Swiss-Prot record:
Xref: SUPFAM superfamilies: Zn2/Cys6 DNA-binding domain
Species of origin: Aspergillus oryzae (strain ATCC 42149 / RIB 40) (Yellow koji mold)
Family to which this protein belongs: Belongs to the ERT1/acuK family.
Biased composition (Low complexity): 547-559
Entry-linked Pfam families: PAS_13
Main location, first listed in the record: nucleus
CC terms in the record's Gene Ontology section: nucleus
Protein name per Swiss-Prot or TrEMBL: Transcription activator of gluconeogenesis acuK
InterPro entries: ERT1_acuK_gluconeogen_tf (IPR050335), PAS_13 (IPR056751), Zn2-C6_fun-type_DNA-bd_sf (IPR036864), Zn2Cys6_DnaBD (IPR001138)
Skewed-composition ranges (Polar residues): 29-40, 174-222, 268-290
Ranges where the record places region Disordered: 1-61, 137-162, 174-228, 264-302, 547-574
PANTHER family xref list: TRANSCRIPTION ACTIVATOR OF GLUCONEOGENESIS ERT1, ZN(II)2CYS6 TRANSCRIPTION FACTOR (EUROFUNG)-RELATED
An MF annotation (GO) of this entry: DNA-binding transcription factor activity, RNA polymerase II-specific
Length: 688
């Protein structure tokens, strides 16, 4: 027998004497052998012999998921229980905790607490484990009547005197007052008289002494830790044991990505679930789903208003409105002028740009104009802040109704850009468009304008470009009936509906034209750059422009006369006539544009053209007469410091009526593969 006999259990005296003879007098060390068995606590049989490690009938020890720090340092087998058997025998049960593994490279920035594995599918809570009493054999006893289960358990068993994580009924609003769920001193305090209607059905069957108070006996409340932990996978119904991950951090991240992906197209009832909103007082709020009856995370039961980390002040700031209102409005942070607002009046003009606030609470998911009745919004001023400071700890009015979130889904959310928000919806397009657009008459008007303005040589160049695509237009439209043409116009209006939002959000001078060259949409920046008003470009106001890019009248050189568009509009009385794109460009730029359009109209559907051009400033007859007197002032303006602000942009092209620009445009086709509209972005080359 070798010296390893010291690790076995005591043997009979005869065997011990034989061992002393074989080992050459080991001495008294063999009288008190050490038992190094740990984990399951099974010791070898008292036979005087150590079990053969290669014996297949030898009982196998269950491998622990993570060894404690002491066993990890000693390279010994540990168990899942804390404290483990070895630390108990060595008197180190108070310092027994999980050892720290070496992190993978992709987890070097992850906190150590996030890498802690779950035990039996349940969330591991150090506070819960430290408060549990020790049983006789040194193991933690949650409840003597609780039966062990090998399957993952995400729902606390009703036999234990605990508080159910998944509630079936609504929480009482005044039952809890807490700090942030990530606070180290996060505790829960309950009012015993106020929890009759707040706890779940299984908790109501418990004795009145059992509650969720932090001062409750730890032996009766195994869930004495934080009631809500954002890293708890049970709150999202994540079964970490079914995911083949070696650490909790990676499994939780993978599960959260799947949770977000599967909730992208949920119904309105699941909109709060895909947001993952946080409940009041830092706790998760739950309500039963209509299908399975199980609890779903993220819903606000009973119409309660969720708090942001349990702070009523942050909640009132995010809503930005009194508690008497029934809807949460994003625009409440920046209200209109004259309604108790602290925003200056010049920032709330209809033409002034507005910024929108992005909140961190559930109120940011509400539609800007989702209310069903007019209401007055109040801003975040000093009076509101002072009243919120002196309010109750729960921050809710005793009689006021709870605000509700009315957003159906995040993908249908519309952001409020300004006060002049479009009030129509896309369905109005399909209801109002009853007639096809008269493209034939518009092409005739374009031909008459080109013949009247341009010289015969340039008119011929433009006519050749349009004639090259004329057969393609005839071939694609000869099979279309009236219903198809009406549908074509609906497609145009619906596409224009989307482009208007892009134009308002983009700071680049942009215009959108029909295939005839008529302006259909224009951005504010383009009007600032060229001086053309939006109503004039869209045909809502008369066009009094006389600038055709020729010489200045009275300069001594001959220039081709041009009749204002009033005579053209007279050919179609009673109907407004939008401005043609050819009226915004000089002669050479118009010829180049139609040559490129003939190549791109039925060619590359994804192609675009990027080149330079000269845009014409909007000038009336009075402006042209006063232009010679202002040339000296314009020259001195350039010597002082170049272009600055909107006033400086208006001075571009002041001298000769032309603006040197670089522009890019493309052709958008409809469902019949016919050129539908032209989208153009321009930028002045004089801006530095």
């Amino acid at each position: 027998m070798t010296v390893d006999a010291q690790d076995s259990t005591p043997a009979p005296p005869a065997d011990r004497r034989g061992a002393e003879l074989e080992t050459g007098g080991v001495g008294e060390q063999s009288e008190q052998p050490k038992n190094k068995s740990n984990g399951d606590g099974n010791a070898p049989a008292e036979t005087g012999q150590k079990p053969n490690p290669k014996d297949p009938s030898r009982p196998r020890r269950k491998k622990a998921r993570r060894a404690c720090f002491a066993c990890q340092r000693a390279h010994l087998t540990c168990g899942d229980e804390r404290p483990c058997q070895r630390c108990i025998k060595r008197g180190l049960q108070d310092a027994c905790h999980d050892g720290v593994r070496k992190k993978a490279k992709y987890l070097h920035d992850a906190p150590d607490g996030a890498l802690m594995p779950g035990i039996g599918g349940n969330f591991y809570n150090n506070t819960m484990r430290s408060n549990l009493p020790l049983s006789r054999n040194g193991a933690n006893a949650v409840n003597a009547t609780t039966q062990p289960s090998s399957s993952p358990n995400f729902y606390p068993t009703p036999q234990s005197n605990s508080y159910s994580v998944y509630q079936e009924n609504t929480m009482n609003q005044n039952s809890f007052t807490s700090q942030s769920p990530v606070s180290p001193t996060f505790t829960l305090k309950a009012n015993p008289a106020a929890r009759n209607n707040s706890l779940s059905s299984q908790v109501n069957q418990q004795p009145p002494s059992t509650g969720v108070s932090g001062a409750t006996n730890p032996s009766q409340n195994p869930f004495a830790g934080p009631f809500f932990d954002p890293s708890d996978p049970a709150l999202f119904n994540f079964d970490l044991s079914s995911m083949n991950f070696e650490n909790r951090y990676g499994a939780l991240e993978f599960g959260m990505l799947g949770h977000m992906a599967t909730g992208a197209g949920d119904s309105p009832s699941d909109s709060a679930t895909q947001r993952g909103s946080m409940g009041r007082s830092g706790s998760a709020q739950f309500s039963g789903t209509p299908i399975t009856g199980a609890a779903a995370f993220g819903e606000s039961p009973g119409g309660q208003q969720p708090f942001i980390f349990g702070d009523p002040l942050l909640n009132e700031w995010s809503s930005g409105q009194p508690t008497g209102q029934t809807h949460v409005n994003v625009g409440g942070v920046y209200p209109q002028s004259g309604q108790g607002s602290v925003i200056p009046g010049h920032l709330t003009k209809a033409d002034a740009p507005h910024a929108f606030a992005i909140e961190s609470g559930p109120g940011s998911f509400a539609s800007p104009n989702a209310t069903t009745s007019p209401q007055i919004t109040t801003g975040f001023d000093d009076a509101t802040f002072s009243s919120a400071v002196t309010a109750k700890s729960n921050g809710l009015s005793a009689n006021g109704p709870r605000p509700t979130i009315t957003t159906p889904s995040l993908k249908h959310q519309n952001l409020q850009v300004g006060v002049r928000r479009r009030q129509r919806n896309p369905s109005s397009i399909y209801e109002n468009v009853k007639e096809p657009y008269a493209y034939t008459n518009r092409f005739h008007n374009l031909t008459a304008f080109i013949q009247r303005r341009f010289s015969p040589q340039k008119t011929l160049q433009i006519a050749k470009a349009l004639a090259s695509i004329r057969p393609s237009f005839i071939a694609t439209t000869k099979t279309l009936n009236r219903d198809d043409l009406i549908f074509m116009e609906k497609c145009f209006q619906r596409t224009l509906f989307e482009y208007e939002d892009f134009i308002n959000a983009c700071g680049t001078p942009t215009i959108v034209c029909r295939r005839t060259g008529e302006i259909a949409a224009v951005g504010k920046e383009f009007s600032i750059l060229t001086g053309w008003k939006k109503d004039v470009l869209l045909g809502k106001e008369p066009n009094l422009n006389v600038n055709t890019g020729g010489s200045v009248p009275g300069s001594g050189t001959s220039s081709r006369s041009f009749t204002p568009r009033g005579s053209v509009a007279e050919s179609t009385p009673g109907r407004p006539q939008p401005v043609f794109l050819a009226e915004l460009l000089d002669d050479d730029s118009v010829v180049e544009f139609y040559e490129d359009f003939a190549r791109l109209a039925f060619g590359d559907s994804r192609g675009s053209v990027m080149t330079t051009c000269k845009l014409l400033k909007y000038k009336t007859k009075e402006d042209m007469e006063n232009q010679s007197d202002d040339n000296q002032r314009w020259n001195s303006h350039l010597r002082k410091g170049g272009i600055a602000s909107e006033a400086g942009m208006n001075q571009l092209g002041f001298k000769d009526g032309k603006i040197e620009c670089a522009y890019c445009w493309t052709v958008k086709r409809d469902v019949f593969d016919i050129p539908m509209l032209i989208v153009m972005n321009a930028s002045s080359t004089n801006l530095r």
